Amino acid sequence: RLHAIRTVLASCAVVLAGPAVARAQKVHQLPTTPATVAWGFYWAGAKPALTVNSGDMIDIETIMTNSPAGLERMGAKPDDIPQWMRDLYAGVPQDQRGPGGHVLTGPIFVNGADSGDVLEVRMLSITLPIAYGYNGCSGYMREFCRAPGDSGAGRGGRGGGGGASRIIPMNREKMTAEVAPGITVPLKPFWGSIGVAPPAEKGKVNSNPPHQHAGNMDNKELVAGTTLYVPVWTKGALLELGDGHAAQGDGEVDQTAIETNLKGRIQVIVR
């Protein structure tokens, strides 16, 4: 995926987190369940999954953009797929999914935020709750996706169009992953999609392209210790996070990163 992010770059900034300017009043828990996800969209009309105050912190959980069935087709062991992932896919009806494919946790309604404000989102910590991710190689890179003689058939996941998807084990102690024989990359987890609801007149927007609401920027610099500033377009901001990546280069050259589940703590401040 190659995104036109000119608008996003003009309206969002990534900087190193500085000293706290608003002491957190409370730490909230936001797991990923059928009742706490926005499946494939950012939308001003979405029902909040959580309501917080400016300065509050949220311990949040997000799911990778692939199904338990897809992961098993790639070779993941059934016992390595958390039960809550199966419950999520069983619990969200098809008519509540889309138009995009990202399963985002939220929305988070921030009291006091309204159109014209700026929402400061601090990435305080980001961790890897499972020891694997996957890569779906496709698009114009498809001819490089497979080993010689490998058709890629039946390997499932998002790597369609003649590509291939595969499980990538991760060493969480060393924070590395071997992505190919002899090629090891450092793990620097981040959320590929962080955004707020767009203006109400935009309706329910696809989670795939980033825009004025931020969203699917796939910015590998948004690791723990950084801060994102996003313009607010609707009451409460309606913040969503997802599309967790364990590692990524400068863009998703083969269409994905090392996609995985993430847990982390964020802090939200209205400016």
Kindly label every feature range from the protein language model:
Residues 6-18:
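Bacterial N-terminal signal peptides
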Residues 65-77, 126-137, 236-246:
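Short, Lys/Arg- and Gly-enriched loop/turn segments at beta-strand edges
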Residues 99-103, 109, 124-223:
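Intrinsically disordered, low-complexity linker/loop segments enriched in Gly/Pro
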Residues 189-216, 220-271:
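Conserved mixed alpha/beta catalytic, RNA-binding, or beta-rich assembly cores of soluble enzyme
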